[in-house]
A protein has these predicted regions:
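Short beta-strand/loop motif that positions the catalytic acidic residue
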Residues: 56, 61-64, 68
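C-terminal catalytic histidine-bearing segment of alpha/beta-hydrolase fold enzymes
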Residues: 77-80, 84-123
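Hydrophobic anchor at the start of a short beta-strand
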Residues: 12, 60, 90
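Conserved Rossmann-like nucleotide-binding pocket used by diverse enzymes
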Residues: 39, 63, 91-93
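Acidic catalytic loop of the alpha/beta-hydrolase fold
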Residues: 66-74, 99-100
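Gly/Ser-rich "nucleophile elbow"/oxyanion-hole loop immediately N-terminal to the catalytic nucleophile
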Residues: 1-13
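Primarily recognizes the serine-hydrolase "nucleophile elbow" in alpha/beta-hydrolase
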Residues: 10-56
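A short beta-to-alpha transition loop/helix N-cap that caps and shapes the active-site region
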Residues: 45-50, 70, 101-103
Length: 123
C-alpha cells in the first residue's frame, strides 16, 4: 500500500508549464499510478521511446501554442497520441499564441479542472 493511501490522501493532479509539464508527463510515463490526472501546458514528449504503461482513463489536458517557437504543436500532438495509446483520456487543444501562457489557457485549465477534479480526487 502506498503511503498516501495509509493517510487517506488522494493521488495528486499535476499542473505543469513548459519543462514543468514535461516533468509531469515523465511521471505519467514512469510512475503511471502516482497521478490522478494532469494539465500539461506547452509540453513535449519527455522520452524518445518510453516503455508502454497502463494509463486506464487517466484524464490529461494538453494545451499548445500554434505559434510556439520552442515546442511545436505537432510535438505535443505526438505526446497526446502516445498517452491515448496507453489508455489516457486526453484532450489536446491548440491556441493561436506562442510559448507564453494566455488567458485562454487559464480559462480552459480552470474549466477542465472543475469538470475533472471531483472524479480524480475520489480515488
Amino acid at each position: 500500500m502506498c503511503p498516501r493511501a495509509l493517510w487517506g490522501i488522494a493521488s495528486p493532479i499535476a499542473l505543469g508549464y513548459s519543462n514543468g509539464a514535461n516533468i509531469a508527463a515523465a511521471v505519467l510515463l514512469l510512475r503511471p499510478t502516482e497521478l490522478a490526472g494532469a494539465i500539461l501546458l506547452r509540453t513535449t514528449p519527455p522520452f524518445a521511446h518510453p516503455n508502454p504503461v497502463k494509463l486506464d482513463g487517466v484524464p490529461v489536458l494538453i494545451v499548445s501554442g500554434a505559434r510556439d517557437p520552442i515546442i511545436q504543436p505537432e510535438s505535443a500532438a505526438k505526446l497526446a497520441s502516445l498517452l491515448e495509446r496507453y489508455g489516457a483520456a486526453v484532450e489536446h487543444r491548440v491556441f493561436p499564441v506562442g510559448h507564453e501562457l494566455s488567458q485562454a489557457d487559464v480559462t480552459l485549465a480552470q474549466s477542465w479542472w472543475n469538470k475533472q477534479a471531483p472524479a480524480m480526487t475520489n480515488n
